[in-house]
Amino acid sequence: FFHQWYPYIDVSAGGSVRGTIAAVDMVLPLIDEDTVVIPGHGSTVSDRAGLTAYRDMLQAVTDRIQVLIDEGRTLDEVQAARPTTEWDPVWGQNFMTPEHFVRLVYGDLTGEL
């Protein structure tokens, strides 16, 4: 869990964005509003709302990129569509830039990594 950072997902080692979403979906029912969530990366602790925001961002970006892939868009065209724009001011300010994250998700979804 990367608190307010776009995550690095090691697709080459079997990771996937959909697998990351599924993992968060398994955890969310196990915690409540009083649970302190310790992220693996990020400068502060989080909570259920923070983990939910992470999951929702991952799902929305994945859905947006999948639509563009289904339309036959290339990576350059997907990058130009800026599918992460609304999250970039918070999530895109660390080592995983919006461009790198879009490339990672696109590559994961198309198998072109």
Task: Show where each model-derived region lies.
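Catalytic core of the metallo-beta-lactamase
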Residues: F1-P29
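Glycine-rich, flexible loop/turn motifs
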Residues: F2-P7, D47, P83, W87
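Alpha-helix capping and helix-loop boundary segments enriched in small/acidic/polar residues
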Residues: V11, T52-A53, Q93
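Divalent-metal (often Zn2+) His-rich catalytic cores of metallo-beta-lactamase-fold enzymes
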Residues: R18-R73, E77, A81
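C-terminal regulatory/interaction regions
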Residues: D70-L113
